[in-house]
Amino acid sequence: MPTWIVVSVYVVRDLHLSPLQLVLMGTAMEAAVFLCEVPTGVIADTYSRKLSLAIGFLGMGAAWAAVGLVSSPTAVIALWAAWGVSYTFTSGAYQAWLADEIGVESLGPALLRGARIGFVGTLLGLVALVALSTVSLQASVVAGGMLTFACGVLVAAFMPEEGFTRKPRAERGRPWAELAQTASAGARFVRARTLLVLLVVSELFAGMSSEAYDRLRDAHVLRDVGLPHAPSLGATMWFGAAGAVATVFGFFAVGVLIRRVEHRSTREVARVLVALLAVVFAAELVFARVGAFGVALVAILVVSLARSLLAPVYMTWLNQQITDSSVRATVISIAGQADAVGQAAGGPAIGAIGNAFGLRAALTAGALVLLPAVGFYGRALKHDGREPELEALPA
């Protein structure tokens, strides 16, 4: 999150990207994710989760650092696409690696505890990058990229991988045939399970909504709402302070959430997920319509907190439905691909609304698009949050 904050301010304040260009950044990224999400998930399932994670962090770090070194909107959009390709190597691979190492039954609490540790790292990184941005916003963007690149080096050097085992050499086919077989098995696994289909469709609408908020939030605050008059506090200081407050609240909220979902039923996990998504919808709608900075700031904090809790809960529920470890990363990537389709398809339309009718209209449309996702998650609860008994997946 710290690098996202300084990058989002950098492209609005220093590079002066238009609403359409801001959304096109996300569209390019999500188009890349759509094309590469499943293939890279298949690589993680076929070859190595660790290798996939290392490639992803190295690529994301390099792309972020390069954004701080260019000034052309076209170059920034292209680098965002490169970031998206790199991200797909981490999407699904991390959760699949963790499930293999500790078991699915321990995955939920581990993801939440990991999120809690992540809040600490986010706060430390936020303080460092915001402090650096007071000297040079461009330097803080480059530094954030280099830190992400360093994570890739650490993963390659020190991350264990004992739970994942490749097929014996005698059972392997040609590389492309082996990848195609894994992809086909993952797709069949999703199609055969009603609940997984509902989760994937929900991600489609969630992606459309998040694209509007993620790309237009800071522009709305800077151009429509306006920052309080405080000569000593720049935009990065305000956004950094908001991020820090959300991080502190998130740290304590995750502790409460761990106690709520640990050793609880799948239905309880599903209930928490639906509630968090409803909170995100309400807060995004308030943010889109208000003009007071204080109310907008509270809405930003609520969205940030709810979404940070939503991610590990969603992954817990999704992984509870995946009973075949050999396609785990692929199935997670299919869900991620649905999110990417939503962002790539909805982004240009919402950006055009912003250009024609203003940022408030675009953000309102983005919030309303989230309603079908809430409805689909609610429908999934009719299955008690668990997949009904089905016939075994055909070979």
Label every model-predicted segment.
Residues 160-199:
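Juxtamembrane intracellular "pre-TM" segments in multi-pass secondary transporters
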Residues 80-119:
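Cytoplasmic helix-loop-helix junction between adjacent transmembrane helices
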Residues 144, 149-172, 379-390:
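Helix-loop junctions on the cytosolic side of multi-pass membrane transporters
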Residues 1-34, 194-244:
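Helix-loop boundary and gating motifs at the non-cytosolic
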Residues 53, 270-273:
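Primarily marks hydrophobic transmembrane alpha-helices of the MFS/SLC 12-helix fold
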Residues 58-71, 277-291:
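C-terminal ends and interior cores of transmembrane alpha-helices
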Residues 33-71:
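Conserved MFS/SLC helix-loop-helix module at the cytosolic interface between two early adjacent transmembrane helices
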Residues 32-35, 238-262:
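Transmembrane alpha-helices of Major Facilitator/SLC transporters
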